[in-house]
Amino acid sequence: MKLRIERLLRIILLALFVVSCSTTKNAKKADFIEGLSAKEYWENILSNCGGMEREALTAKMSLSLDVSGKTTRVNGTMRIKKGEVIQLSIAPLLGIEVARAEISPFGVLVIDRMNKRYVRVSFTELQELANAQLYFHTLQALFLNEIFLPGKKDLTSRDLSAFDIELVGRDVRLDVRKTKRFAYTFLMQGTEALLKESLVGLKDANYALSWKYENFRSLGQKQFPNTMKLSFMGLKKPMNATFSLSRLTANSNWESYTKVSDKYEQVKLEDLIKRLLEK
């Protein structure tokens, strides 16, 4: 169980370091796409995955971690309140929570209940460690199946000019234009304009995060993926994660922020990373 939690913490920390960097907006218009102009298609994207309507999400979660060919599966809960917090709770047996990761605009809180320790780190500290501009809203968009521009909370009709857009077979590819350190690519599912993959990578290295979305089902008036597959590319050891979601609702009746018990020991982020790398 201890190894499972350490692998989970490793996945979460790595995701934070890979995503997000500031971008410069510029314009390029596309030809017609399946009878739609680029502007019309962009409006479909905003309607489906522009992030304007999903304010809360709660789901049962089965998380599968594959590190160097070794697979670990744990159950838990995913909770999100847009603009406030992302909570991942791990409760493998009888609904008893053993670990929690809480990400908010203020920073990241990781609680290891088995060892009664926790890490609390601000986004400023993460930026210094990663040497990149990190944004809460970028990570939130990945979990909510939303297209995004780093540093911007919501997209509008005017933001089409920030992307290159082209047909790739029956799908549509969008690339954020004129970024500096990171490259951002979104792959849309044909005329349905459902986001099927987000790809974030370093321009001067082979490191990248692929976040794929599958098994779309109705959630309110929209479609939402019940399966998310993450692949960390460029690492010495292959690392993948799969979120399988069920019982999805828009319930927001839960505490946004976790209060840590005084009995828990606060551990520095550097110490935690060192412990994980030693495993």
Model-identified regions with their sequence ranges:
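Sec-dependent bacterial lipoprotein signal peptides
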Residues: 1-21
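An acidic-aromatic
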Residues: 85-137, 141
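N-terminal leader/targeting segments and the immediate start of mature chains
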Residues: 21-72, 269, 273-279
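Extended beta-sheet lipid-handling architectures
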Residues: 54-61, 73-75, 89-90, 96, ...
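C-terminal low-complexity, charged extensions that often adopt amphipathic alpha-helices
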Residues: 129-161, 273, 279
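Gly/Pro-enriched, hydrophobic low-complexity segments
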Residues: 155-265
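Edge/loop elements at the starts and ends of beta-strands within beta-rich repeat scaffolds
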Residues: 49-57, 69-72, 79-84, 101, ...
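Short, cysteine-centered beta-strand-loop-beta hairpins and adjacent loop/turn segments enriched
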Residues: 66-70, 95, 235-236
